[in-house]
Amino acid sequence: MSVSTAAADQSVCTPLPVLGRDVTVPLVTGGEVSYAALDYAASAPALQRVWDDVAAYAPYYGSVHRGAGYLSQLSTDLFENARKTVADFLGCRPADQVIFTRSTTDSLNLLARVIPADCQVFVFETEHHASLLPWQDARVTYLDAPRTPRQAVETLERALADRDPYGPALVCVTGASNVTGELWPVRELAVAAHAHGARIVLDAAQLAPHHPVDLRDLDVDWVAFSGHKLYAPFGSGVLAGRADWLQAAEPYLAGGGASRKVTRREDGGVAVEWHETAARHEAGSPNVIGAYAIASACKALTEAGWDSLVTREQHLIAKVREGLAEVPEVRVLSLFGDDAPRVGVISFVVEGWNSSHFAAALSAEYGIGVRDGLFCAHPLVRTLLGSDAQTQGECGAPEAAPGEKSLNAIRVSFGAGTPDEHVERFVNAVGELVAEGAKWQYRTEDGRCVPAV
């Protein structure tokens, strides 16, 4: 479908209303413009519906599982119903547990704490650091970056078959890259993992906001995601999946809520009986607003219809990719090639530009918010840029003059709340900056490239 056809196609739905859609920001060149939020991959704006639901509940806030009063009972019901909503959203199996955490990072660190002592972990070097780093106490095999989905499956199959000893194993894989937006062959990787007696956890931080995620259909053992990327930025995340490892392990955090019974022992110490439900790993007063916000977002996306949401996002992806393709100095980063299916996450570099300088100009001169740096995926960005594994990369602005080559990139990302005008302004701004240069001078301050005023 061409951009012109898509624009006229009534099947392309309108953006979902998001908080902040009417915010204006000042331009360094004078005047104001509506803010084009194109950094959804870092944090997506709250859906208006999510905000409205949270605001409606807030006066009734009460403690969860800790009170006999009406507001406490209401809040407890809200919290547990949110758990059920998330389970339905993820297609959880009847015996699966849904645990509310702080984020994807927190979820994967929780899982890392509960894996069996002799478990081997297999993870591709292309993962976000939230998936790459939590396994420090386990035997970890880091797999080289594949250049095709088929190569990813074959690489995993070889590694699992060759493991010694042939014991418990866990594979951690992303559903969609936070750098390239490319979809990974999750179902095929799950088949490979299970064929070799391993389990698999899906990092769905970048997948769940863009595509339906179904544990049973994908046949993954666990899934992790963050509310703040799912249009519910209120401090909660989710780990959902098989209960056995979770029930067998010591609680992630020790404290009230996780304990079912605490008694004094004859030797003067204390004996603890931990819950076997999700509460085992939810010690402390839970973030009921965060959980409720995630549930609200799950309902909103489901009711909007995934077919419509995906169609609209593909329309926006086509606009951006076609626009960038018209600028010869732009190189879009990709593992699997131009034809690989992807979500609305695109990273690129511009010949003759420092990526931090380019991102700063987009913000200061056009009111466009993107991200620059290594995107918490340092090994992947080094691979995509063809640099040595030990080369120092840059997160934020380097101590370098504008135009000096840098080991970082620019990322534009969008989703259900993005209007056409935002991506059109972005494409036009890229072309104009490359053709005419920045209108302002920039300098480095506290690790960021900022206008020199």
Positions of the model-derived regions?
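Pyridoxal 5′-phosphate
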Residues: M1-V453
